[in-house]
Amino acid sequence: MAAAAATMSKNRPNAAILGYPVTGSDVKGCCATAPDTISCVDKNTCPCFIFATRTDAVVPVMNSIRFMEALVQADISFESHIYSYGPHGFSTCDTSVQSGDTTISSRVPNWVSDSIGWLKEVFGDFGNGGMTKPVCKAHVTDNDGEFLSVDCTFGYVMGKPEGWKVVEGFLGGAGKQEKLEGQEAPQMTLEMISMASGMKLRQILEYAHMPEEVIEQVNDQLSMIPNQR
């Protein structure tokens, strides 16, 4: 149900914690009309915290893995913990729900404190009369943002003529050597460009030894370009 709320509901939660979830077609074994939530993951899916065990004999761990793959494809932030062994339905692993002789990794209970820490990263923490600023954004990159930025992927900006023109103005064009602050920027071959296409532009510029203040200048110019999708 949590996975369905995160991927399908009209009013979606701001974050979801999914424990050994049934997310794929296996759910049909429980209810013939139940949805396959993996296929419903989209850009509006909220950040997710997922935990499971490798040896779950009731819900195959591939439910969690394929759901995470869908989150990656949709650029959604998530944290996951797949522990080495343990039964299905371990809950918090407290003695009220698990007997002392249950065969389960001693680290499984960590998901409780880890998920709380993750929620603080997503929502912010309590401090000085208010909430601190979240450090984990809903999307890993800015590819779906209203405007371009250096936190879009390198390949995405390359595909936007206006955006790439800005970057070229600072780098001097891919494949050329250029000095920045007395240092030579590394030459980018086609192979390197292909490999780097999924990296954030910010990371590429840092790799090229571009000073932070110059990176911010690039970002300022990109932020004036609407992200036409």
Model-found features: residue ranges?
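Loop/turn elements at helix/coil->beta-strand transitions in domains of secreted/extracellular proteins
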Residues: 12-15, 45-47, 74-79
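C-terminal catalytic histidine-bearing segment of alpha/beta-hydrolase fold enzymes
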Residues: 72-141
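Conserved alpha/beta-hydrolase "acid-adjacent" motif
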Residues: 57-66
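Compact, charge-rich alpha-helical regulatory domains located at protein termini
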Residues: 144-228
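Alpha/beta-hydrolase-fold catalytic nucleophile elbow
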Residues: 17-20, 51, 83-84
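Primarily recognizes the serine-hydrolase "nucleophile elbow" in alpha/beta-hydrolase
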Residues: 1-43
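Short beta-strand/loop motif that positions the catalytic acidic residue
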Residues: 44, 49-52, 56
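Acidic beta-to-alpha connecting loop that harbors the catalytic carboxylate
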Residues: 54-57, 85-87
